[in-house]
Amino acid sequence: MLGICRGRRKFLAASLTLLCIPAITWIYLFAGSFEDGKPVSLSPLESQAHSPRYTASSQRERESLEVRVREVEEENRALRRQLSLAQGQSPAHHRGNHSKTYSMEEGTGDSENLRAGIVAGNSSECGQQPAVEKCETIHVAIVCAGYNASRDVVTLVKSVLFHRRNPLHFHLIADSIAEQILATLFQTWMVPAVRVDFYNADELKSEVSWIPNKHYSGIYGLMKLVLTKTLPANLERVIVLDTDITFATDIAELWAVFHKFKGQQVLGLVENQSDWYLGNLWKNHRPWPALGRGYNTGVILLLLDKLRKMKWEQMWRLTAERELMGMLSTSLADQDIFNAVIKQNPFLVYQLPCFWNVQLSDHTRSEQCYRDVSDLKVIHWNSPKKLRVKNKHVEFFRNLYLTFLEYDGNLLRRELFGCPSETDVNNENLQKQLSELDEDDLCYEFRRERFTVHRTHLYFLHYEFEPSADNTDVTLVAQLSMDRLQMLEAICKHWEGPISLALYLSDAEAQQFLRYAQGSEVLMSRQNVGYHIVYKEGQFYPVNLLRNVAMKHISTPYMFLSDIDFLPMYGLYEYLRKSVIQLDLANTKKAMIVPAFETLRYRLSFPKSKAELLSMLDMGTLFTFRYHVWTKGHAPTNFAKWRTATTPYQVEWEADFEPYVVVRRDCPEYDRRFVGFGWNKVAHIMELDAQEYEFTVLPNAYMIHMPHAPSFDITKFRSNKQYRICLKTLKEEFQQDMSRRYGFAALKYLTAENNS
C-alpha cells in the first residue's frame, strides 16, 4: 500500500509541476516586461524601434531571457512525456502482473475499476481507511462431508489461520461424521477469535437430491446452491470455499473485494482456467451453458442479503430444471448451475482477479495467471488426482501445500491483540485451574499435564463398522506413538474385530502415518479400525489421556483394554464374544482378565492354542509378563491355576495389580494425572475394584508382549530421581482422592500400599 501511495504522490507532484512551471515563468516574464510602469517588448527589433533607452547590455539580457523561456518549454514537454508514461504504467503498478495477463478477461471486475482509477488520478485512495476493519469478523462457509474431506478442511483452515489478522467465523455444512470430527478438533484446538457453527448437511439433501450429478463430490457438491436458505438470515456476506483450497495470503484481502461490488453484482467468481466450458476438450464434448470460459466455484463471494431479495432460490431452480431437460445431469456439480444462471444474468457476477483461484486441474491454463510467487493468493487443487495432477509448477505448489499440511497447529493458537473475543467457558476454567498451580513446585510440569488440552482429530481414516445382531461386539482399545507403528499390521492380523487406537503424533508424523497406512494392504483392507490422532504437546507422554480418547470413541458395548505391544491370540475376538454371554457381562460388574505373557524374541512362532503356549512356557520361549521385574503386576492372575483351568475363575485385587481386562464401555476412565511411565494402569484397576468390579480370569485366553526398545519415558523414570519422587507424590494424592470418593472402603488401598 505504501508503494502505491508513493507512486501516486509522484504522479501528483508531476502534475503540479506541469501546471506551476509555465505559470511561474509567464508571471516572471510579464513582471519583467515592465520598466517604470511601462510595458517592455520582448522583441529586440521592437525595442530598438520604440525605446530610446535601448542599450547593448539590455539586448543581451533579453536574448538570455528568450533562451531561458525555450528551455522551460522543453522541460515542460519532457514532463508531459513522463506524465503520460506514468499514466500508462499506473494500472500495472496497482495490480502487479495480473492485469497484464487477464486484463481483457476481467472486464466486469478489477479492470473497470482500474480504468476509472486512472481517470480519477488514483490519488484519493492513499488517505482512505482499510477496506476491512481491524476487528471485523470474516465469515467463511465450507461444505464438508466424510472422513477424507475432514482432513482436507484442516489443511485449508491452517492456511487461513496462518495468514489471518481478523476474527473468523466458520460456517460448516457437514454430515454427522464430519461434524463429530471437526467439532472435537476445534473444541480441543482452542484458537482465539475463531467461532464455528455447524449446519446439518443431511437435512439439506432433499433440497438438491433431485439433481442428477456425475461429479466425484456427489450430492454434497450441490449444497452451495442452498446457502442463502441454510445460513442465518442476518448474515449479509460470506466467502465460500472448497475443501481443496490453500491460502497464500490474508483472507481479509479477499473479504475487502466485497466493497468493489456495484449495482446488481452478487457473486464474486474467478474465470474458469480450463477450456471445459468451451466444449473443445474432446470430440462430442457438450458442457453446460456458460459465459465464455465460465466461472469456477471453488472460491465464491456471496452477497447473501441481495441474493435473497433477488429470489436466488427460485432463480437457480428454474435454470436447473430447464437445462436438465437437455443435459440430463450435471458434470461439475453446483458449478454447472451457477454458470447457467450467469449465462442468463451476466450482471450478477463480479469477476475476481485470477490469482484468487489458481486452478490446478488436468486441463488448466493457470500458468498464464501468475509470473511470480507474490502473485499467488489461493491455490485450488480441483482435480480428482489432487497432488498428483500434472502441472509444470506442481512441485512448487505441492511444497506450499505440504507446508500447511505438516505445520504445527498448536502454533496457531495466537491471540489477536486489541480485538475483544467471546468468553469461552472451557478456556476460562482451564486458565483458572492452571493459575491455582504452584509454578515453584518441583512437580509442576506433572500437575500441569493433567489440564493440558491436546488437539484431537478423531477418525483420521475412513471408519465403518456393522454391529452384530446379538450385541456382543468387543473393541480392542490401545494407544501408541510413532515408534510402535510397526505393530499395527500384526495386531490387525490377530484381531478381526473393531479396533480403537489413539496415536500421539506431531502434525508431520500424522502425515507419515497416513502415507504408511495408505501404502499398507493390510490396514487399507480394514474399515473397522478407528485411528484418533492426539497431537503432541508438552514433554510427557499422556498415556491415560490417550486411553480415554480411544475408549470414548468405540461403537461396541464392550472393550478390551490392551496395549499396542501385545498380540492377542488368534481367535480371541470370537472367544471374548462368547465369554460376554457366558459371564452375563451386560448385567454384571465384571472385568474379564486376559492373562499376559511375553517373549524376548523378535521372531516368534506364535502359539495357536493354549497347549502350544504352555509348551513354549515350559521350554523358556515364553514367560509370564514382567515376572522378573514387576512380579506384583500380574501375580494375582494366578498363572499356576490358569495352566489347568477349564472354566473362568475369580481373583481378588492386590496392591499394584494391573491386568488387561475386558469391560463394558461404561467403565470409569483412566486418571489423567499419571503421565509417562508408572502407575497408569494400576490406578485404573484400583478404581474398578473400588467400584466393586469382579475380576474373572478367562481360562482359554492369552496375549503375548513383543519385545521393543525402551520408551523415552521409562528411560526418564529409571534415570531421573525427581521423576520418581513426583510419581510417588501423585500416587499418594490419588489414594487420598480415592478415600474422599469411596469413603471407608478405600482405606484398604492405603493399607495395601504401606504393606507392599
Swiss-Prot record:
InterPro entries: Glyco_trans_8 (IPR002495), Nucleotide-diphossugar_trans (IPR029044), Xyl/GlcA_transferase (IPR051292)
Keyword field: Coiled coil, Glycoprotein, Glycosyltransferase, Golgi apparatus, Manganese, Membrane, Metal-binding, Multifunctional enzyme, Signal-anchor, Transferase, Transmembrane, Transmembrane helix
Sites where a glycan is attached: N97, N122, N148, N272
Tissue/organ expression: Ubiquitous. Highest expression in heart, diaphragm and brain, where it is especially found in cerebral cortex, hippocampus, and trigeminal ganglion.
Annotated residues for binding of Mn(2+) 2: D563, D565
Pathway: Protein modification; protein glycosylation
Residues in coiled coil: 53-95
Region called Glucuronyltransferase activity, residue ranges: 414-756
Protein family according to the UniProt entry: In the C-terminal section; belongs to the glycosyltransferase 49 family. In the N-terminal section; belongs to the glycosyltransferase 8 family.
Protein name, UniProt field: Xylosyl- and glucuronyltransferase LARGE1
Gene this chain is encoded by: Large1
